[in-house]
A protein has these predicted regions:
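Cytoplasmic helix-loop-helix junction between adjacent transmembrane helices
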Residues: 108-145
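Helix-breaking motifs and short loop linkers at transmembrane-helix boundaries and internal kinks
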Residues: 43, 75, 96-101, 294, ...
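Symmetry-related core transmembrane helices of the 12-TM Major Facilitator Superfamily/SLC fold
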Residues: 169-185, 392-408
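Helix-loop boundary and gating motifs at the non-cytosolic
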Residues: 8-57, 235-239, 247-261
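Juxtamembrane intracellular "pre-TM" segments in multi-pass secondary transporters
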Residues: 2-11, 191-236
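Structural signature of the two symmetry-related core transmembrane helices
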Residues: 79-92, 297-312
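Core transmembrane helices of Major Facilitator Superfamily
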Residues: 28, 109-121, 332-344
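Helix-to-loop junctions at the C-terminal end of transmembrane segments
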Residues: 63-75, 282-295
Length: 420
């Protein structure tokens, strides 16, 4: 932004980015906890329900590859509008799905849209938020996203009661994405609100905003970048994949657990929504811990807590108070996840080469998303072969090993308190 532009404030991006993000995440928050429930209602086994829930993460992983080129070609705001429209199509497909396979395709498409929306909003912030405000804006964006993930399930409770089924709650995704589209379409041009931005021109190409250029660089030559940085990605990137895997396993296992215990659809949404409130409440604390004490004091306790929460689930499924233990485990997992808020983005920023960070950050994000995509498939496979308790126990063991791995690797690559 140029010096002649109007004075910037964080509130100026509230309607442009924060409100569409809140609406999109409310829709996702309403839908995600009920995917396994909807799948089993359509006749899927517990294992297949896990696969269908995991299609969201698989879609995000696949969407990582073309999303940068798409955002660079059509722009940040148009990409967010397109992603929200595609999400509406996916949500309608989920509502009307006659069988588990159609539901799985709809959830996969939603994952593709989520990848594009996430990159587009990040690119928008890069283009229009001055550097000195960017960390606060991105931190607030993360908090807004987490707020939606706990508001969504709570909104779905009365909708489930009114419609009589889990798929009825998917209408929340449709309505919230439609509202996001209307906001993005009706807003004036961003450069009218924030002033002119410096545009990047390369030979034979049109002008790009800095965010569009960042998006293109992140996805260009992804596999070449993975090979170039194979050393640090094998050591630290594997840690990112483990964190992604633990988070995805939590997202899939909690609803699966509720189904296996016979918890009602409305109560499932309520429990996961309240757990999301705990997660949301800790996102600022995580940033303070990372800045004051070092990245290791966020990454290791978070991963360890996720592992211990999974082990608690594994050993309490068949106890007389299994539902009480389920609620306790959901709370522990949410505290652990909240303590790790922003850790993957922060570690990626710390490790990225300062001169040209975008390609590395694209490879870093892909590595974390690969772990997220793999975890639900592992959970589904173990559930199908053995039981959901064995699946939780295996993921819990991975969490313990992941915490040990991060405790060894982070001090080797990142100072105890970066910037001090």
């Amino acid at each position: 932004m140029t010096d002649g532009n109007p004075a910037f404030s964080i509130r100026s991006v509230a309607v442009v980015v924060f409100l569409p993000t809140l609406l999109f995440s409310i829709g996702e928050g309403a839908l995600i906890p009920l995917i396994p429930v909807a799948a089993t209602n359509l006749g899927a086994s517990l294992a297949i329900a896990g696969v269908i829930a995991g299609m969201l993460m698989i879609g995000e992983l696949v969407g990582d590859i073309p999303s940068g080129a798409l955002v660079s070609r059509i722009g940040e705001r148009t990409s967010m509008i397109g992603a929200a429209l595609l999400s509406i199509v996916a949500a309608l497909g989920a509502v009307l799905a006659p069988n588990p396979w159609v539901l799985g395709v709809a959830i996969f498409i939603l994952g593709l849209a989520t990848a594009v929306f996430a990159l587009a909003r990040h690119a928008f912030m890069t283009s229009y938020v001055p550097l000195r405000y960017r960390a606060r804006a991105l931190s607030t964006l993360g908090g807004v996203f987490r707020a939606g993930l706990f508001i969504g399930p709570l909104l779905s409770v009365p909708v489930i009661h009114f419609t009589g089924g889990a798929q009825g709650a998917f209408w929340i995704m449709t309505i919230s994405c439609l509202a996001a589209v209307l906001i993005l379409v009706l807003l004036p041009d961003p450069e009218t609100l924030f002033g002119q931005v410096h545009r990047v021109r390369k030979s034979g190409a049109s002008d790009h905003t800095p965010g569009e250029e960042l998006a293109a660089e992140e996805s260009h030559g992804l596999f070449r970048t993975l090979w170039r940085f194979r050393g640090v990605l094998a050591r630290m990137g594997s840690g990112a994949a483990l964190i992604g895997a633990m988070r995805a396993a939590r997202t899939v296992l909690l609803p699966l657990w509720a189904v296996s215990l016979g918890v009602s659809e409305a109560n499932t949404a309520l429990i996961i929504g309240l757990a999301g409130a705990v997660d949301f409440a800790l996102f600022y604390v995580s940033g303070q811990v990372m800045d004051r004490f070092g990245r290791i004091w966020s990454a290791v306790p978070s991963t360890l807590g996720l592992g211990l929460g999974m082990l608690l689930l594994a050993f309490t499924h068949d106890t007389p108070n299994a539902v009480v233990w389920f609620i306790a485990a959901a709370g522990i997992l949410s505290v652990a996840n909240g303590l790790g808020s922003g850790i993957l983005m922060t570690l990626g920023a710390d490790l990225a080469p300062p001169g040209r960070p975008a390609p590395f950050l694209g490879a870093w994000r892909f590595t974390g998303d690969a772990g997220s995509a793999a975890a639900p498939l592992v959970v589904a496979a173990i559930t199908g072969l053995l039981s959901v308790s064995f699946a939780a126990g295996a993921i819990g063991a991975v969490g313990i090993l992941g915490a040990w791995h991060l405790a060894r690797m982070i001090p080797r690559y990142i100072p105890a308190r970066p910037g001090r």
